[in-house]
């Protein structure tokens, strides 16, 4: 096979496949270009969710996970799955960071605090991970265990917390260990937008025992509902017994924050655990000699113990291109720029030699249904300019529209989003083929193909549906077979005539 120049991987973010037309923005959109590509070129389907991308079975895919798998050429096991495995295999008590936290509590005759999002949403945390930690504390005979549940209502229904609080109370009773000490909504404890007044409310409840008060967790929830505040918005509430807080965070204690997603775990971690902190004034009671464990790495500059540090991905697609002296271009609008750079490169911020990046600003609107085309036309113009330079061997391009507009739940807007992408593909793809290039057209997960749930209400989440793969401009007689996202990098390496490194366990999907 002659080496194409350029070889482009085009990712239509949130573009899944479904036979249903009802609520399917992709089927309802007018897409003459995509229709033509599907008709004229070999196509197949890829798995983009669950175990095929390193998530638990049945878990919908997402953009971070999708791009990690696309760039790594192997299934990248997510923190969620790694923690599940450790619990299933009984290795949690042997984890260094967790073992040290237990030892710290024993040495100081102090308390262990378990804090995290209490739900089975699986996006930031999972209630089973809390249960695994409680079982570990019981096996290790820790006497003082306090739980600080953060209520969800975003990755779960808005008023579903009672179910999870009941499950937690039952688990504590079954194990004969631990008490619930505070209850708060994620709006406060998990803020990520530098609204430090929210973080401070959580801090005050955790450290000072100040805030709303209740005699138990369910009462705390009920008084919040009575004030018309759903799970996410529960004001930090201190559980009191005999007029005293059940358990505040004190000197020499240990905290395990069991959220595995970093972005919403950083602010409260800074406030509780970092020596240098000036977002608000911390009180004299600020805990000294606190052993604070992050379940995953929230920020390497925190220098805190991490239970499940990031896995290093050696010989990803971008790294191999660079070693071979190939020139590569990564291009996307702001919303998906990190995905075609940081995540595609295996969660590494550094740019490889020979890798150029183009960031096109996303439009400044409150929600993207107001501008469903987003910056797709600008991304397209920028790419066409870059094609004129004729210097890139490989291009990685992301169109954000089907995902970001799909999240709004507005069907008409999602249809327009898909049509905008179709129009852009009609300009880009023929141009690449005319240059002697080839295109792999795919997606990272589903979204826009399901805009309605079973009750006919707006559906705003990702899906577990398969995604398409179309191989455009390839040699006569070469097709593609079904696979998973991790098979894309080995497929591209074969097209480029490069060997697949042993670290890549994905398979080339080319058929002859």
UniProtKB/Swiss-Prot annotation:
Domain of life: Bacteria
Active site: 63 (phosphoserine intermediate)
GO molecular function: manganese ion binding; phosphoglycerate mutase activity
UniProt EC number: 5.4.2.12
The keyword Manganese belongs to this UniProt entry's keyword annotation: yes
Binding site for Mn(2+) 1: 403, 407, 462
Pathway: Carbohydrate degradation; glycolysis; pyruvate from D-glyceraldehyde 3-phosphate: step 3/5
Cofactor note: Binds 2 manganese ions per subunit.
Reactions catalysed, as given in the entry: (2R)-2-phosphoglycerate = (2R)-3-phosphoglycerate
Pfam families: iPGM_N (PF06415), Metalloenzyme (PF01676)
Positions of substrate binding: 124, 154-155, 186, 192, 261-264, 336
Family in the record: Belongs to the BPG-independent phosphoglycerate mutase family.
The name this protein goes by in its record: 2,3-bisphosphoglycerate-independent phosphoglycerate mutase
Source lineage: Bacteria, Bacillati, Bacillota, Clostridia, Halanaerobiales
């Amino acid at each position: 096979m002659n080496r194409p120049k350029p070889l482009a991987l085009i990712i239509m973010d949130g573009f899944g496949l479904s036979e249903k037309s009802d609520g399917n923005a992709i089927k309802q959109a007018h897409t003459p270009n995509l229709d033509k590509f599907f008709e004229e070129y070999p196509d197949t389907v890829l798995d983009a969710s669950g175990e095929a991308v390193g998530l638990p079975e049945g878990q919908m895919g997402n953009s971070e996970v999708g791009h990690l798998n696309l760039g790594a050429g192997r299934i990248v096991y997510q923190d969620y799955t790694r923690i599940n495995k450790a619990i299933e295999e009984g290795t949690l008590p042997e984890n260094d960071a967790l073992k040290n936290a237990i030892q710290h509590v024993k040495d100081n005759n102090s308390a262990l605090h378990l804090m995290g999002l209490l739900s089975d949403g699986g996006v930031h945390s999972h209630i089973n991970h809390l249960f695994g930690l409680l079982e570990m504390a019981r096996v290790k005979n820790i006497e003082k265990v306090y739980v600080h549940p953060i209520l969800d209502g975003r990755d779960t229904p808005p008023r579903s917390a009672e179910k999870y609080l009941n499950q937690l109370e039952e688990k504590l009773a079954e194990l004969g260990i631990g008490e619930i000490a505070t209850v708060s909504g994620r709006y406060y404890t998990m803020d990520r937008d530098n609204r430090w007044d929210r973080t401070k409310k959580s801090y005050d409840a955790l450290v000072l025992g100040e805030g709303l008060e209740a005699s138990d967790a369910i009462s705390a929830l009920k008084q919040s509902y009575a004030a018309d505040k759903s799970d996410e918005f529960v004001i930090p509430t201190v559980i009191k017994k005999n007029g005293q807080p059940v358990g505040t965070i004190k000197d020499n204690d240990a905290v395990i924050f069991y959220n595995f997603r970093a972005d919403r775990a950083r602010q409260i971690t800074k406030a509780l655990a970092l020596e240098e902190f000036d977002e608000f004034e911390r009180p004299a009671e600020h805990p000294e000699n606190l052993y604070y464990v992050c379940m995953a790495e929230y920020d390497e500059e925190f220098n805190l113990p991490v239970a499940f540090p990031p896995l290093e991905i050696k010989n990803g697609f971008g790294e191999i291109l660079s070693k071979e002296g190939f020139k590569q271009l990564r291009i996307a609008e702001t919303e998906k720029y990190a995905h075609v750079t940081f995540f595609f490169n295996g969660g590494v911020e550094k740019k490889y030699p020979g890798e150029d990046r183009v960031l096109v600003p996303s439009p400044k609107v409150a929600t993207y249904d107001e501008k469903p085309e987003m910056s797709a036309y600008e991304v397209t113009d920028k790419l066409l300019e870059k094609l004129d330079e004729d210097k890139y061997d490989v291009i990685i391009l992301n169109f954000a529209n089907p995902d970001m507009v799909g999240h709004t739940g507005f069907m008409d807007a999602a249809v327009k989003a898909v049509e905008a992408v179709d129009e852009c593909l009609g300009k880009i793809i023929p141009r690449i083929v005319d240059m002697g290039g080839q295109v792999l057209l795919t997606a990272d997960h589903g979204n826009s193909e399901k805009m309605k749930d079973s009750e006919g209400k707006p559906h705003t989440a990702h899906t577990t549906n398969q995604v398409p793969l179309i191989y455009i401009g390839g040699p006569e007689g070469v097709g593609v077979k079904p696979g998973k996202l991790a098979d894309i990098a080995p497929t591209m390496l074969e097209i480029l005539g490069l060997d697949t490194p042993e670290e890549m366990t994905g398979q080339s999907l080319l058929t002859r």
